[in-house]
């Protein structure tokens, strides 16, 4: 049985696809790269944003035509199955549906002669998804979250928090390092909620990272994924000690979403801006060169001009290293979708205005690195084919004179230029320090 898989969305989805590939190969299937060669077509969907949903629905219409010509079986997997099963079933009634909670049953669905609708159920944590692309490994440490944000459809799709057993994560890291990964991305919807479902005596994120560092030898670097302020704060000091470890990137991703307490309350976020600010200040006081990334949504229902300008001021004040900016889009079955909406032209104006501030702040922060010498680990190629390295704090450095065969090595670089998004540099004397 030949299976083609098409994937949309986040790191968790890419990891789920890798798990599906492994399971399919174990049950006698061949994963192919050409959709026209496939007996079975799997589309792993994402539902976090309206534009992504629309792109997937448009693609599914085209795949329906391919299925008619090739007589292939169609399976739709991923977050749209959990959050919008009726939309999918109406568009493609002949497709089997497999939610993220049922991904471990993919072989059963592929080999079934019937259309299967596996939507409900609990996610199995007996096997952990592992996605390796080049020298970068993405390892989920948990599924779901403890939040109930008014705008978020991912909560509906990924559901309640389920942490993967500590030893399973450690084993996955060991396997990734064995296969040549030099960057280990520990990912989840909220990494600092790890272990909160495992009981009072269960491991938390700092415990997990210490166990990895102790039990997995080799030259690799750990990047910690997104951590919500309310779950980060209780483990903050412990996590700071872990961040000081040589093999952990000095990097945190803490979503702010809005600096207006009025909007945060409407969003059902579990912190105030003042609490968020204290976390950022504490991190910088202990690790001065730490990189702090954040997420901001503009145009959420209830956000007025004053709220927006509070957020604008906060970005200028806190000097974030990286900001992922999103215009709010209503998602089905969410509380915010039923609220009075901010007009689209207003959302667009706020997005454009804040984007300019983000660029100015990013450029100011990154210019501090110009003419500095830095050790970098060469992790991947950019979409243009340039070699990209990472500083100790995960700042990206595009190396203009490095060749693709050097990915996976460490080197010293001279930083010559800066943009708001990355640094540009060259190898010092072309010397590679160490193969990792």
Regions inferred by a protein language model and the residue ranges of each:
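Proteins enriched for Cys/Gly/acidic motifs involved in redox and nucleic-acid/cofactor modification
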Residues: 1-194, 252, 274-285, 309, ...
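Short, glycine- and charge-enriched coil/turn segments that flank and shape catalytic ligand pockets
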Residues: 30, 34, 67-72, 112-117, ...
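Short strand-connecting beta-turns/loops that link adjacent beta-strands
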Residues: 36-37, 68, 146, 259, ...
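Conserved SAM/AdoMet-binding glycine-rich loop
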Residues: 74-78, 83, 178-305, 316
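Glycine-centered loop/turn positions within well-structured domains
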Residues: 104, 147, 159, 192, ...
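Hydrophobic, well-ordered secondary-structure elements that form the walls
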Residues: 254, 295, 315, 323, ...
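Terminal RNA-binding accessory module
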Residues: 330, 338-436
């Amino acid at each position: 049985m030949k299976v083609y898989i098409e994937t949309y969305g986040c790191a968790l989805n890419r990891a789920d696809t890798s798990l599906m590939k492994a399971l399919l190969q174990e049950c006698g299937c061949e994963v192919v790269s050409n959709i026209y060669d496939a007996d079975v077509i799997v589309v792993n969907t994402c539902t976090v944003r309206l534009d992504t949903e629309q792109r997937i629905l448009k693609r599914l219409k085209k795949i329906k035509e391919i299925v008619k010509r090739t007589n292939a079986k169609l399976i739709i997997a991923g977050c749209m199955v959990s959050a919008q099963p009726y939309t999918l079933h109406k568009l493609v009634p002949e497709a089997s549906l497999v939610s993220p909670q049922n991904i471990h049953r993919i072989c059963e669905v592929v080999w079934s002669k019937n259309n299967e609708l596996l939507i409900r159920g609990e996610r199995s944590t007996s096997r952990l998804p592992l996605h390796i692309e080049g020298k970068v490994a993405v390892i989920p440490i948990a599924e779901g979250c403890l939040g109930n944000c008014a705008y978020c459809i991912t909560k509906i799709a990924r559901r309640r928090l389920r942490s993967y057993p500590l030893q399973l994560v450690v084993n996955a890291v060991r396997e990734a390092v064995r296969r040549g990964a030099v960057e280990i991305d520990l990912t989840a919807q909220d990494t600092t909620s790890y272990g909160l479902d495992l009981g009072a005596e269960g491991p938390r994120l700092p415990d997990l990272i210490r166990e990895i560092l102790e039990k997995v030898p080799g030259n690799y670097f750990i990047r910690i994924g997104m951590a919500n302020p309310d779950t980060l704060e209780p483990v903050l000091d412990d996590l700071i000690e872990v961040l000081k470890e040589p093999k952990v990137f000095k990097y945190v991703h803490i979503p702010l979403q809005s600096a207006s307490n009025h909007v945060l309350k409407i969003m059902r976020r579990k912190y105030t801006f003042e609490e968020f600010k204290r976390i950022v200040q504490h991190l910088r006081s202990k690790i001065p060169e730490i990189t702090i990334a954040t997420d901001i949504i503009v145009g959420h229902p209830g956000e007025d001009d004053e709220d927006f300008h509070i957020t604008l001021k906060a970005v200028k004040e806190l000097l974030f290293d990286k900001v992922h900016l999103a215009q709010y889009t209503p998602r089905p079955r969410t509380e915010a979708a039923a609220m009075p909406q901010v007009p689209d032209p207003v959302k667009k104006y706020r997005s454009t205005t804040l984007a300019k501030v983000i660029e100015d702040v990013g450029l100011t922060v990154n210019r501090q690195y110009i003419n500095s010498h830095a050790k970098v680990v060469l992790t991947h190629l950019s979409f243009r084919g340039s070699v990209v390295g990472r500083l100790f704090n995960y700042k990206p450095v595009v190396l203009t004179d490095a060749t693709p065969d050097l990915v996976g090595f460490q080197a010293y670089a001279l930083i010559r230029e800066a943009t708001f998004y990355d640094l540009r540099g060259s190898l010092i004397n072309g010397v590679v320090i160490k193969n990792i």
